[in-house]
Amino acid sequence: MKFFSLIPIILLSACATSYQSNGLTGGFEDTELSPGYFRISFRGNGVTSSERVNEFALLRASDLMLSNGCKSFQVLNGKDSINTSYVELPRTTTTNANIYGYGNYASANATTMTYGGGLKSVHRAKTTIDVRCINAEADPSQNIFDTNFINNKLKQKYRIN
């Protein structure tokens, strides 16, 4: 029985936005605003946590910095947001009827039941960060991160090759 209760958790975790370019299920977008200076956005879907969204934005920053030969990078500013939308859930109505007859007499009864329906809120996290290439020692108190360290740790955490 415990195995079956894990199935929904496994299915939901498999549906979180993967590390990918922006598409229907979310992903990253980046723009180089000037040499070594980028604006990066990462948008999740309805089952992607804010933590994952923020870490994937950092992962994208580290990928860009690696491709530009930067030892470290600095996060200059960031903005987190949650987009909430509503989905109408399907409603099912079932009617059961019984007819009883005896001689010239008949009677009937019917029961109608309605299930489901209503609205479900869906929350989609998004983060946008501005980062710049900086060749300095890592100092998290100044939002300066080691490019290789961040890249390796986040790829290991999320099992990305």
Segments predicted by a language model, with ranges:
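Secreted/extracellular ectodomain signature
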Residues: A16-N161
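C-terminal motif of bacterial Sec signal peptides marking the signal peptidase cleavage site
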Residues: L11-A14
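Sec-dependent signal peptide recognition
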Residues: M1-I9
